[in-house]
């Protein structure tokens, strides 16, 4: 991932240095397991633990000849050792090291993402409680529907992110799995104890069965979860973008002193952070499709997945780490304009209360069709003539003969629509 969208802690996980260090840890742990079984002398393993090292430039130099990165790595490590070098990679195949180390790196990345998600959920929760009763227009198909609150909108986001948090925990468990089962998964040249030992030391589970590789449905599921989280963030960001339009201006991203919105137009205050979220989500969703393409490998393995995963797994975790942190700050510092929300509610001249009038007429004994046919012409007239809907209702004898002035006034009270806000918040555990 390019530096612009990278945060140091996450990026550090995916450096060549950290990747090779993970490979080395798998190699040494495997030797420790062999020592427990009495195959490798414990003194040799002690020396390996103390002295085994690598030089990245040397690995790359060797790889020019071997055209195999793991062989280059093991040779470079062997050069740092004495007689005990013969135990490097003992009984292992390349993917025993690579796949197990990859899962270990993903575990490191997951620990960061989990904290990011939990922080984001908490930020949305506090913002929802702050705006629990901030009344605003609910829109369906982009058209004014009925009143809601900004707090309810945020509470919806909070509940969605709680689901994403649970999905992530499940995907985390599914991907934090290692395998050291040999060339085709039969443990022909490796004792299953070695796999169990290494995985336990790394905080991974051992795959119940594998071929030369871990099966890539795990990685596809993991990437799908990252993509869904990114898409939820995009969904929220698109909402902010819509509400920040000049003709709406119900919310606005924080605009810092000295910030510029346009090179040409000094007045511009654009929702660039939210727009950025949309672009980043597109990238992660694209990576998800690549992960799905990686599932059908040939027989017990091929390496068609390898080149893709070197890109998509680091990039996706780095990108989501960036998204979660940037959008958390956008929500936390979001400027909300309650007066604009109320002003926008009035722009449709009371049409948002049409259902209340409809139901009130039904309560007097009209059929639904009769009530609808009575109210709709008045609503259409309000649209077309830009006349307050309430005035037309109060002038319509078919309505006033059934509804008292007090009842009509009651139909146009937005507080009616907020009567269950407390109940919804309690149901969500946000009270």
From Swiss-Prot:
PROSITE patterns: FUMARATE_LYASES (PS00163). Its EC number is 4.3.2.2. GO terms for cellular component: cytosol. The active site is at 141 (proton donor/acceptor), 262 (proton donor/acceptor). It catalyses: N(6)-(1,2-dicarboxyethyl)-AMP = fumarate + AMP; (2S)-2-[5-amino-1-(5-phospho-beta-D-ribosyl)imidazole-4-carboxamido]succinate = 5-amino-1-(5-phospho-beta-D-ribosyl)imidazole-4-carboxamide + fumarate. One of its GO terms (biological process) is 'de novo' IMP biosynthetic process. Pathway: Purine metabolism; AMP biosynthesis via de novo pathway; AMP from IMP: step 2/2; Purine metabolism; IMP biosynthesis via de novo pathway; 5-amino-1-(5-phospho-D-ribosyl)imidazole-4-carboxamide from 5-amino-1-(5-phospho-D-ribosyl)imidazole-4-carboxylate: step 2/2. InterPro entries: AdenyloSucc_lyase_C (IPR019468), Fumarase/histidase_N (IPR024083), Fumarate_lyase_CS (IPR020557), Fumarate_lyase_fam (IPR000362), Fumarate_lyase_N (IPR022761), L-Aspartase-like (IPR008948), Pur_lyase (IPR004769). SUPFAM superfamilies: L-aspartase-like. The keyword Lyase applies. Changing residue 270 to D/L: Abolishes enzyme activity. N(6)-(1,2-dicarboxyethyl)-AMP binds at residues 4-5, 67-69, 93-94, 212, 263, 268-270, 276, 307-311. PANTHER family: ADENYLOSUCCINATE LYASE. Homotetramer. Residues from neighboring subunits contribute catalytic and substrate-binding residues to each active site. Catalyzes two reactions in de novo purine nucleotide biosynthesis. Catalyzes the breakdown of 5-aminoimidazole- (N-succinylocarboxamide) ribotide (SAICAR or 2-[5-amino-1-(5-phospho-beta-D-ribosyl)imidazole-4-carboxamido]succinate) to 5-aminoimidazole-4-carboxamide ribotide (AICAR or 5-amino-1-(5-phospho-beta-D-ribosyl)imidazole-4-carboxamide) and fumarate, and of adenylosuccinate (ADS or N(6)-(1,2-dicarboxyethyl)-AMP) to adenosine monophosphate (AMP) and fumarate. Influences the affinity of glutamyl--tRNA ligase for its substrates and increases its thermostability. This is Adenylosuccinate lyase.
């Amino acid at each position: 991932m390019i530096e612009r969208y990278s945060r140091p802690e996450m990026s550090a996980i995916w450096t060549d240095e950290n990747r090779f260090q993970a490979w080395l840890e798998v190699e040494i742990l495997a030797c420790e397991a062999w020592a427990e079984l009495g195959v490798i002398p414990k003194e040799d393993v002690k020396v390996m633990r103390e002295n085994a090292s690598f030089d990245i430039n040397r690995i790359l130099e060797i790889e020019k000849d071997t055209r195999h990165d793991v062989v280059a790595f093991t040779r470079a490590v062997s050069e740092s050792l004495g007689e005990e070098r013969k135990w490097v990679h003992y009984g292992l195949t390349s993917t025993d090291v690579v796949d197990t180390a990859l899962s270990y790196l993903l575990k490191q990345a997951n620990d960061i993402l989990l904290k990011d998600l939990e922080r984001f959920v908490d930020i949305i929760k506090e913002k929802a409680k702050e705006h629990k009763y901030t009344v605003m227009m609910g829109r369906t198909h982009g058209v004014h529907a009925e009143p809601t609150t900004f707090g309810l909108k945020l509470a919806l986001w909070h509940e969605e992110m709680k689901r994403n948090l649970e999905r992530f925990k499940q995907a985390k468990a599914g991907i934090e799995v290692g395998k050291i089962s040999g060339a085709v998964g039969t443990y022909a040249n490796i004792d299953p104890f070695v796999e169990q030992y290494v995985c336990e030391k790394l905080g991974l589970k051992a795959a119940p069965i594998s071929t030369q590789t871990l099966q890539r449905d795990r990685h596809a599921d993991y990437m799908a979860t990252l993509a869904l989280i990114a898409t939820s963030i995009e969904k929220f960001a698109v909402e902010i973008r819509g509400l920040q339009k000049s003709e709406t201006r119900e919310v606005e991203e924080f605009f810092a002193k000295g910030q510029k919105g346009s090179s040409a137009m000094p007045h511009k205050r654009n929702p660039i952070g939210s727009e950025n979220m949309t672009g980043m989500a597109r990238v992660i969703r694209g990576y998800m499709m690549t992960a799905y393409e990686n599932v059908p490998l040939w027989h017990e393995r091929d390496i068609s997945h390898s080149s893709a995963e070197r890109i998509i797994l680091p990039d996706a975790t780095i990108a989501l780490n960036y998204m979660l942190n940037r959008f958390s700050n956008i929500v936390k510092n979001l400027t909300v304009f309650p007066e604009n929300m109320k002003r926008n509610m009035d722009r449709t001249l009371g049409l948002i209360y049409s259902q209340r009038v409809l139901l009130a007429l039904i309560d007097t004994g009209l059929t639904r069709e009769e009530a609808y046919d009575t109210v709709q012409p008045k609503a259409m007239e309000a649209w077309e003539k830009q006349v307050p809907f309430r005035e037309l209702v109060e002038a319509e004898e078919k309505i006033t003969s059934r509804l008292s002035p007090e009842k009509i006034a009651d139909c146009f009270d937005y507080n009616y629509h907020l009567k269950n806000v407390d109940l919804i918040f309690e149901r969500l555990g946000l009270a």
